[in-house]
Amino acid sequence: MAWLRFPRFRRAVNVFNPKLFENLSLAAFLAWVGLGSDALSSSAYGPPEIYYALKGHEYLAVFLAIGIPISVFVISAGYRQVIALFPDGGGGYHTASTLLGPKAGLVSGAALIVDYVLTAAISVASGTEALLSTMPASWYGERILVDVAILLFLIFINLRGMKESIKILLPIFMAFILTHTILLGWGLLSHVGAVPDIAYNTVASVRQDSMQYGWIFIVALILRAFSLGGGTYTGLEAVANGVHIMREPRVQTGQRTMTLLATSLSLVAGSLIFLYLMYHVHGQQGQTLNAVLYGAITRGWTVGGIPFGPTATLLTLITEGLLLFIAANTGIITAPIVMANMAVDRWLPERFSYLSDRFVSRNGVLLIGFAAVVILLMTGGHVSILVVLYSINVFITFTLTMAGLSRHWLAQRDKDPLWRGRLAVSALGFVVTASILAITIFEKFDAGGWFTLLVTAIVVGLGYLIYRHYKSISKITAELDETMLDVVPEHLESGPNLPLDPRGATAVFFVSRFDGLGLHTLLTAHRMVGGFVKNYVFLLAGIVGQGEFKGIKALEDLKVYVETEANQYMAFCRNEGMAATWFATYSTDRILAMEELANVAIRYFPQSIFFAGRVIDTSAQGPFHGLLHDEVSFIVQDRLQHDGFSMMIVPVHVRGIPSKPPNIVLPISMSPDLELVQNEEVKKEEARVRAAAKAQATTQANIQESTPHAGTE
C-alpha cells in the first residue's frame, strides 16, 4: 500500500536545526530596528503633544527638553534590570507575574495587549497622514483605505517571519536616522547663538509666572505636559518583551539594544522640543508641528543655486511616515509574544502559545492586526481621537513593573550588596511612571480614557474566566488520571520484547502523555478490537510553543519528556502481553505533526486503525468551547477517512452524564428476525422473574413454618 500523504500547504521545519536560532535571532542593531522603531516614531506625535500643552507658556519647553531624556533613561534603567532578571523575555508581564503575583501579571498583560493594538492603529494613521500631507488635499479623504491596506500588508509580512519583516523595513529605519540626524543637527548648530537669549527669557518668564500664578501652577503645567506626551515612552517596553528573540548572550544584547533605544529617543525627542522653542513654531492648518519645524529649518537651503529645502522637508516627512509604519509593525511583532506568554499561563486560549511553521505566533498576529483594523474603522483613522486612547495602558505596565522591581530589591537586601542602588533606580522609576499614569487618567478620562480602561478591564475579566475554565478542566483530568492510573502497577516493569507484525492489524493511538485519557483510549480499543489486533503503536507530537522556543536546551528537555512518556506506554503494553512501539516528532504545528506521524505509522503498518481520546465535560460546553480547545483530532480524522483509513475518537465522560438513557419518542420498526429474538428474550426474562418469585415465596413459607408462634410452649 502506498504511503499516505496529506495535501501539504505548509513547509515543515526541523526545530532541532542548530542554525535555526542563529538565523532567527536578532543582533542588537537589528533588534534596535525592529523593536525600537515604536519609540522613535513617537516623535511624530509625542513631542508635539507636549509642546501644545504649554500653550502660552512655551518657555517651559526648556525644562521638558531636559526632563524627557532624564525620564527616558530612568525608565530604561529599570528595564535593563528586567532584562537581566528575565533573559527569556516577557517584559512587564513576566515581571509583574513573578514579582507581584499572577493577578498583577494579568492586569499588566491585558494593558499591554490593548496598548499594542492602539500602537498599530495610531502609528499607521499617523504615518498615513504624514505621507498624505505631501500629496494633493483631495487624497486626504481616502486615508482610511490606505490605513487598512497598510495594516493588511504588515500582517502579511509578519506571517512570513520575524527577521524577514525587519530586513524589509531596515532601509526605512536607516533613512529616518540619516535625515533626522542631518536636519535636527543642522537646526541646533545653525541657531546655537540663540541659546543665551532662550536661557535669559526662560529665567525671566519663570520669575514672572511664579510671582503671578505661583510655583504650584508651573510644576502642574510641566507635569501635565509630561502626561499628555506619554506616547513618547511607549516603545521602551518592546525591548524587554523581545529579549528571547535576540542573539546570545541575550542579556548583553538586550541591554545594548535598550541603550541604543534610550539614547536615540532622548536625542530626537529632546531636540524636537527644544527646536520648537528655538524656531518659535506653531501649528498650521494641514501641517503637523514637525512639518512646520522642518520647513523652518530647511528654509533657504540650496544645492548649486537650486532650492533644496522643500525636497529635504519632503524626504524627512516621508521617512517619518514610513517609520510610523515600522512602529505599527512593532506592535504586531511584540503583542503575540505577550499573548503567547499569557497563554502559557492560561490567561488566554492555549492556541496563542503555538508557533506557526514560520515560527511566528500566527493567531496573535492575526488578532492584533485585525483588532487594529477595527479600531481604525471605529475612529475613522483620526489621530486626534486615537492619541487620547493611547498612552494610558503602557504606564499601567510601567508602574507595575517598577513596583515589582522595588519589591524584589527590598527582598534581596540581605543577599545583594548592590540592592540600595538598584532599589533607588526602580523606586524613582515607580514615582515617575505612577505620576504620569495618574495625571494622564485625570486629564484624559472624559476625553476617551474611560474607553481604554473599560476595554482593558474587559480583557482582564475574560482572562480570569478563561483561567477558571482551564483550571476546572485540569481538575477533571487530574481526577481521570487518578482513576485510570490505578490499573498501572506501582513499579511498571517492561515485559519481554514481543515481535511486531507489520502485516497484521494495528491499533494506532494519538496521545500526548502517559495519562488517564490515553490509558482509557487504549483499554477501550483493546476491549473492542483486541481479538484481532497484532500491534499497538503510539504517536506523540512534541509541540514547540512559546515556552519551548527559547533555545536548543529547552527543545532537548521537551524531547526527553516525550520519549519518557512514550516508553511508559510501551512498558505498560508489554507488561500486559501486547506488542507495542512508538513514533514521535516535534513541530510548531500540531496538525502538521499528527499528519507526519500518521504517514509514518501507515508506512510501517499498512493495516492501521487510528484512535484518539477526547474528554467530554457536558457541564463546561458552551459557545466559546471551540475557541478554548483545538479540535485537531476531528481535522485529522476527516483527512484520514478521506484517504481510506479509519479513525475512532473515544469519548470519556467526566461529569454531567445523564442519570438514565434518553427517551425514544419516534416509532421504531425492526426486522422480523430481531423481533423474534426480542420476543424470545422477553419470554426468558418473564420465566426468570416467575421462577425468582416462586423461589422467594417458598423460602418465606419455610421460614414461617419453622418459626414458633407466640403463646406456645
Please name every model-derived segment:
Residues 17-18, 174, 178-234, 280, ...:
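Helix-loop-helix junctions that connect adjacent transmembrane segments
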Residues 27, 102, 141-149, 245-268, ...:
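Loop-to-transmembrane helix boundary motifs in multi-pass membrane proteins
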Residues 50-97, 102-111, 122-150, 262-268, ...:
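Extracellular loop-to-transmembrane helix junctions
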Residues 179-186, 334, 339, 344-345, ...:
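Hydrophobic alpha-helical segments of multi-pass membrane transport proteins
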Residues 185-198, 256-295:
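Extracellular/periplasmic helix-exit of transmembrane alpha-helices
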Residues 351-363, 398-445, 476-486, 623-624, ...:
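C-terminal membrane-solvent junction of multi-pass transporters and transport-like membrane proteins
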